[in-house]
Amino acid sequence: MSISSDIVMLQETKLSEDEANKFVKYCYGWEGVATKEIGAFGGLCILWKPNKVKIQKAEGSIIIPKRGSEEFLSVIGHLERRTDLYKSISEDDLSVMDGGDRVFADISAMASTLAYENKLVIRKRVNQHWKMHFVEFFDFWDDHLQKKSTQAFVVCDKEIDAKLIVVAFRGTQLFEADDYITDLDFSWYDFPQIGKVHLGFLEALGLANRSIDKKSSHHLETQDINKPLAYFVLCQKLKNLLQIHKNAKFIVTSHSLGGALALLFLAMLFVNKEDKLLEKLLAIYTFGQPRVGDKEFGDFMNSKLKQSEPKYFRVVYSNDLIPRLPFDDGLFMYKHFGVCLYYNCCYCQKNLVEAPNRDLTLVYFIPIRITAIWELLQSLVLHYIKGESFKETKLSIISRIFGILVPGISAHSPVNYINAIRLGPPRLNPTLSNVKG
């Protein structure tokens, strides 16, 4: 039986007539197939229709982005795909310069998320999507790990006569073992001036080295050019930029581990009496930041941050695990300080002394899983209510499903922090008078 009239070639194919006949005969026992030998995409598929079979030859290649290219995204980049700021920074925003305004909170959250990407992705996002000016990407040396493991980038609102400078540290990368070594190393470093602080975070900034058991004495002019140290290089970079942009102020920000680095960077500006730099500080924003030091360190920072306008914005989302670490107990004695800008699972914000369940007690075992189920359901419908920009990626949805088993991990996603800033109050005011608990 010949069915050549019932077989249509939809695309060009490299199959010869004989090959096509053999294929169809082998699969279906049919003979007499008419084909043409013309070019192709590759990969053969059979399309069924009533009384008709269509043979389509599609040939192509799997495109794997090259690591370090503009197309190569980190895991975080696949979790959070939003590329645009909530609102472009206007001259009015820059003239008022209110650090608690949503405009600055949003750019801080977005920069903290973007910090997980490579230099080319960051530059493209900043220049093309944010319409800002990319200044530089840094890869800093860690003496303890004996490798470059601390990343940061700097941007300005514009290239000439900038009013805003943003410094963003990279947080903990999901598949980077060195980051977990830093996070889970609960060793102290005792500073006479400021109290005890997390040694691993200090080493990531190039401010300490346990192998020589003393504070780092590096200075910019004596550093190995191939082993740049974060604190010293960024401090000098800010001085240079503020010399060029005399009307500018700066924000330091990050998510996760990077939040701890941002906070310690600020602390060392106080220790080293960098008063001219500190006068230009607009705000420090941390998202899901772990504890950094002991009570003495907290008292030191509170005394330095006592100003009429709040500077320190510590944002915590729901059951995020990382802000509850290292533990605040008799053994570890790590403590947060200042006001916690806490967002619940519905993105409602309130000021607290500390986030609920501060030490991950088993009392919350069932409630946090109920919350995780709610967060999963909410993520599936939020974009219908609030707009397409809140539609989550498949990877983000999968992470929320996994989060029912380990809720604190999925709650740490930058997706939650960007949602919180955009759906929460238009202005944050972390003052003690607003604390509710």
Predicted regions and their residues:
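Short phosphate/oxyanion-binding micro-motifs
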Residues: M1-K66
